[in-house]
Amino acid sequence: MAEEQARHVKNGLECIRALKAEPIGSLAIGEAMAAWSEISDNPGQERATYKEEKAGGSGLSKPCLSAIGSTEGGAPRIRGQGSGESDDDTETLGIPSRNLQASSTGLQCHYVYDHSGEAVKGIQDADSIMVQSGLDGDSTLSEGDNESENSDVDIGEPDTEGYAITDRGSAPISMGFRASDVETAEGGEIHELLRLQSRGNNFPKLGKTLNVPPPPDPGRASTSETPIKKGHRREISLIWDGDRVFIDRWCNPMCSKVTLGTIRARCTCGECPRVCEQCRTDTGVDTRIWYHNLPEIPE
């Protein structure tokens, strides 16, 4: 039922658009309304009337001719979708040709129904208006027509031939994105990112790269980036037994490790000098110096 109403609303909007482009005279509208009223009052005689008109070559062609003109590309049809009528009862009216615009398009008459199934009556509706089928697929009306904006019915997307597609199953057809569609798309994208991350993938398909720093080289962990300055360093050892302080002073090569205790190390790089200025003038390098009180320790 919703698809039928959507189709009727679409056809009604096309009729209104055609009327805005080429208004029809009041005489033609009156004659067409009288003809449709006669057919709707006697639905059982519609087929017989059509056969008589086809044999005699006369009938309702005059109002349709004055309204829209040529039907050479395809004869107009009466489409009654309400009050028990169906597309099987659709009949073709013979209309003389005039001002043919396209050989592959036809002229159709449409009823307009409200949501309760009642036919909408009045000159401003599309009950008695004949419009050319095969109009452009753009269903947007010009100059701010509010009917298309306030309609709750999804009329579908136009196909390549210019007709609205309304029968594609039970799934609704939308002309644009809904908020739920955007949320679903974002959620799916996040889920895909998490899935790839859990597998240890570096996101090659999504254009994202996860840069991880390389692990440190164990062979270079204990070495310094800058070379060690060659030479000697001065070391002092203090030992206090409660009454006296034992002090030792000496020099060790810069390349040797610093350790606890009075240790005179050797050069490991082979480039440190054997003695330095302090070593050369220090008389207590190999002699232990005794100090009885802490204030006696020289600066």
From Swiss-Prot:
Transmembrane stretches in the record are none
Residue numbers spanned by region Interaction with host STAT1: 110-120
Q: Does the keyword Metal-binding apply?
A: yes
Task: Determine if Zinc is one of this entry's keywords.
Answer: yes
Write the record's keywords in alphabetical order, separated by commas. Host cytoplasm, Host-virus interaction, Inhibition of host innate immune response by virus, Inhibition of host interferon signaling pathway by virus, Inhibition of host IRF7 by virus, Inhibition of host MDA5 by virus, Inhibition of host RLR pathway by virus, Inhibition of host STAT2 by virus, Interferon antiviral system evasion, Metal-binding, Viral immunoevasion, Zinc
Task: Provide the residue positions that the database annotates as binding Zn(2+) 1.
Answer: 232, 251, 276, 279
Taken from the UniProt entry, a GO cellular component term is: host cell cytoplasm
Map out region (Disordered) in residue numbers: 40-91, 133-163
Reproduce the free-text note on domains from the UniProt record: The N-terminus interacts with host JAK1 and STAT1. The C-terminus interacts with host STAT2. The C-terminus also interacts with host PP1.
Q: Which family does it belong to?
A: Belongs to the paramyxoviruses V protein family.
What is the role of the protein in this entry?
A: Plays an essential role in the inhibition of host immune response. Prevents the establishment of cellular antiviral state by blocking interferon-alpha/beta (IFN-alpha/beta) production and signaling pathway. Interacts with host IFIH1/MDA5 and DHX58/LGP2 to inhibit the transduction pathway involved in the activation of IFN-beta promoter, thus protecting the virus against cell antiviral state. Blocks the type I interferon signaling pathway by interacting with host TYK2 and thereby inhibiting downstream STAT1 and STAT2 phosphorylation.
Q: What is this protein called?
A: Non-structural protein V
